[in-house]
Swiss-Prot record:
Modified residues (Phosphoserine): S151
Modification sites for N6-acetyllysine: K147, K200, K236, K250, K262
Subunit structure: The mitochondrial prohibitin complex consists of two subunits (PHB1 and PHB2), assembled into a membrane-associated ring-shaped supercomplex of approximately 1 mDa. Interacts with ESR1, HDAC1 and HDAC5. Interacts with ZNF703. Interacts with STOML2. Interacts with ARFGEF3. Interacts with SPHK2. Interacts with COX4I1; the interaction associates PHB2 with COX. Interacts with MAP1LC3B (membrane-bound form LC3-II); the interaction is direct and upon mitochondrial depolarization and proteasome-dependent outer membrane rupture. Interacts with IGFBP6 (via C-terminal domain). Interacts with CLPB.
Region (Necessary for transcriptional repression): 19-49, 150-174
SUPFAM superfamilies to which the protein is assigned, alphabetical: Band 7/SPFH domain
In-chain residues carrying the UniProt-annotated modification N-acetylalanine: A2
Domain remarks: LC3-interaction region (LIR) is required for interaction with MAP1LC3B/LC3-II and for Parkin-mediated mitophagy.
Keywords: Acetylation, Cell membrane, Coiled coil, Cytoplasm, Membrane, Mitochondrion, Mitochondrion inner membrane, Nucleus, Phosphoprotein, Receptor, Repressor, Transcription, Transcription regulation
Gene from which the chain derives: PHB2
Entry's transmembrane regions: none
Descriptive protein name: Prohibitin-2
Superkingdom assignment: Eukaryota
């Protein structure tokens, strides 16, 4: 810039009169360039701007969207807000309904309400997040968590999260903030309470295991009783059958011999069984008498 001015000064006509004219031209051009530069500004994507003038303060009816805009230099200057949602993690220790200490952390996705930027600037300025979010999050967390016992905070986590989100969203509206998402990222208790919960769970598991073993023993006992009753009934029926017809035992021997014969017939080894191998005592006269009586009984 300085070099360009030197070159321009070298080309000016000599003499006091020419020097004065050139100087006026330079000053006029510089003033015009400065005025144009100060009269134009750009609002980037995801931003909004409001005007502050030195006489009336913040202009409540002017909210500028993205793009190129004009202003009156010195008299007006823009205040630009980023209206994109930004995440913030906030942790707060609080107490449950049964007086247990709870460490809870929230991830809050917030953005300013673009339609209320002038009033937000008057109340909170540009650092609205630092002024508002930590205080209202702590307030809502203490209010909601105090409604639940420590165990309910675990078993009803979805309900707790929904209640926190609803109350926090309504509270943020008072400060021209919009909350796009509120989620519980961490929920922990004191070491003493955690140890007590773990001990309780172990005791419950042991009790359930003992109950299972008792039920299993009872079931096995019932099964043995049923089996013994069945065997006793079978023995009783067999005794009655033998007392009524002695040939019944001979028939059982014949059927056993048939089963043995079938097994031997399908075997690869060649075996020639005898009557003794087939559990048949054919030389016993009682066998013949019992068989005859069984046949006559059927007739």
């Amino acid at each position: 810039m300085a070099q360009n001015l030197k070159d321009l000064a070298g080309r000016l006509p000599a003499g006091p009169r020419g020097m004065g004219t050139a100087l006026k031209l330079l000053l006029g051009a510089g003033a015009v360039a400065y005025g144009v530069r100060e009269s134009v500004f750009t609002v980037e994507g995801g931003h909004r701007a409001i005007f502050f003038n030195r006489i009336g303060g913040v202009q409540q009816d002017t909210i500028l969207a993205e793009g190129l805009h004009f202003r009156i230099p010195w008299f007006q200057y823009p205040i630009i807000y980023d209206i994109r949602a930004r995440p913030r993690k906030i942790s707060s220790p609080t107490g449950s309904k049964d007086l247990q200490m709870v460490n809870i952390s929230l991830r809050v996705l917030s953005r300013p309400n673009a339609q209320e930027l002038p009033s937000m600037y008057q109340r909170l300025g540009l650092d609205y997040e630092e002024r508002v979010l930590p205080s209202i999050v702590n307030e809502v967390l203490k209010s909601v968590v105090a409604k639940f016992n420590a165990s309910q905070l675990i078993t009803q986590r979805a309900q707790v999260s929904l209640l926190i989100r609803r109350e926090l969203t309504e509270r943020a509206k008072d400060f021209s903030l919009i909350l796009d998402d509120v989620a519980i990222t961490e929920l922990s208790f004191s070491r003493e309470y955690t140890a007590a919960v773990e001990a309780k769970q172990v005791a419950q598991q042991e009790a359930q295991r003992a109950q299972f073993l008792v039920e299993k023993a009872k079931q096995e006992q019932r099964q043995k009783i049923v089996q013994a009753e069945g065997e006793a009934e079978a023995a009783k029926m067999l005794g009655e059958a033998l007392s009524k017809n002695p040939g019944y035992i001979k028939l059982r021997k014949i059927r056993a011999a048939q089963n043995i014969s079938k097994t031997i017939a399908t075997s690869q080894n060649r075996i020639y069984p005898t009557a003794d191998n087939l559990v048949l005592n054919l030389q016993d006269e009682s066998f013949t008498r019992g068989s005859d009586s069984l046949i006559k009984g059927k007739k």
